[in-house]
């Protein structure tokens, strides 16, 4: 919906938002009319190599059928020295908190969502996809395997979310 794109644009950067979902792009265009949106498959981006200073995906990589391929495509379209950033649900580091969180995600979230949402199944998918997603070190390894340099992450909200970044190497 362009939420992270809007924040980046407010910081003074030129932004081109893309999404696979026409519905998400329509909502994004409504919410962020000043940002251009392009329909794109994350695993086959319609941009030339080395086109952007950065590529950012927020809460979307987990939903791509081939997330490693999408991450590779993000790196491909970023100029050497540029940044690839992924903001995604992750794994709380504190063991007790992780246990409580996992029980909430798999137990309560789908149940509560089915009571208040017309699409309760989406919340079951959300819970399952979060728990199946690699932890912080696992996603960091993906960055390194793709050749991104200085791959690192920062936990947000106790590790419920992690912000990963890596840099495209200079040739």
What are these regions (language model features)?
Residues 15, 84-85, 150:
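A short hydrophobic/small-residue beta-strand
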Residues 68-83:
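A short glycine-rich, Lys/Arg-flanked "PGG" loop and its adjoining helix->strand segment in the class I
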Residues 8, 73-74, 166:
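Class I S-adenosylmethionine-dependent transferase superfamily signal
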Residues 3-4, 87-146, 152:
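C-terminal alpha-helical "lid/dimerization" subdomain adjacent to the S-adenosyl-L-methionine
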């Amino acid at each position: 919906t362009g939420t992270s794109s809007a924040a980046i644009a407010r910081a003074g950067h030129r932004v081109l938002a893309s999404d696979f979902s026409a519905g998400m792009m329509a909502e994004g265009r409504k919410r962020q009319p000043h940002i251009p949106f392009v329909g794109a498959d994350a695993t086959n981006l319609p941009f030339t190599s080395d086109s952007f200073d950065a590529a950012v995906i927020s809460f979307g990589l987990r939903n791509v059928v081939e997330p490693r391929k999408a991450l590779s495509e993000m790196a491909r379209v970023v100029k050497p020295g540029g940044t690839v950033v992924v903001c995604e649900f992750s794994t709380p580091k504190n063991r007790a908190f992780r246990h409580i969180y996992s029980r909430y995600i798999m137990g309560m979230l789908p149940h509560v969502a089915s009571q208040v949402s017309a699409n309760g199944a989406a919340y079951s998918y959300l819970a399952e996809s979060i728990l199946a997603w690699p932890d912080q070190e696992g996603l960091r390894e993906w960055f390194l395997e793709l050749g991104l340099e200085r791959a690192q992450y920062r936990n947000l909200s106790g590790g419920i979310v992690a912000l990963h970044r890596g840099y495209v190497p200079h040739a």
